[in-house]
Amino acid sequence: VEEKSSGVGSLKALQPLLGDDTTVSAEVEILGSRMVLGRVVEKLKLDIVAVPKTFPLVGGTIARRYVGAEPNQPVFGLDSYAWGGEAIQIDSLDVPKDYLDDPLELIAGDNGTYAIIDVDKQTVLQGAVGVRANNKGFSAFVVQLKARPGTHFRLTRRSAESAIDAIRSQYAVKERGKKSGVLELSLLGGDAAQINLILDEILNTYVRQNVERRS
């Protein structure tokens, strides 16, 4: 496997056991299949989206450039936005079917507490880091939350279909050159580490599936 990455995308090359053009085409299909990508979504929990809510236009740039150990102080007094140094990790998130793919927001509280609100600003769940929270079909297990109290995070529980489609919209597989037998996998995005993690898991899943097919 060869790889080349940057802040906006990553490229990896794979030379599987390919015999002819038909096999190459079949392997390309497998690498982009719902079976492979679905396993990647499940393994990496890509159906859970949780990112700091930054101020439009300039907020993202300010947050990316911040290098302090603790969350940055709010700019312009806008303390509901994230200004850098925030972190969140959610191990599990379940919502009622009607809320799949709908935007939610998680608001950090004091001492590791949080509240989740829906688009109508209604609180649907309250909890604390390290403790599973449940309420009327909503369930969450937050394992890390680093933010000033009052900071908002964008939160979405994607359906499997939309999580797979999100990968496919930025993902491509093709043969490098003509009859080379080398497949190139590329993925675009804003987080180089996350991109490489996804591509690595696609490759690992593909290899495992090949082993299963041949056993």
State where each predicted segment sits.
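Short, glycine-rich, amphipathic interfacial segments at transmembrane boundaries or analogous
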Residues: 1-23, 116, 124
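Solvent-exposed, non-transmembrane alpha-helical starts
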Residues: 8, 196-197
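A short, surface-exposed, charged and often Trp/Pro-enriched helix-loop connector in the C-terminal portion
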Residues: 22-23, 176, 182-183, 190, ...
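Solvent-exposed coil/turn segments that connect beta secondary-structure elements
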Residues: 2-6, 34-36, 43-46, 111, ...
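Alpha-helical transmembrane helix bundles of large polytopic membrane transport and channel proteins
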Residues: 37-144, 148
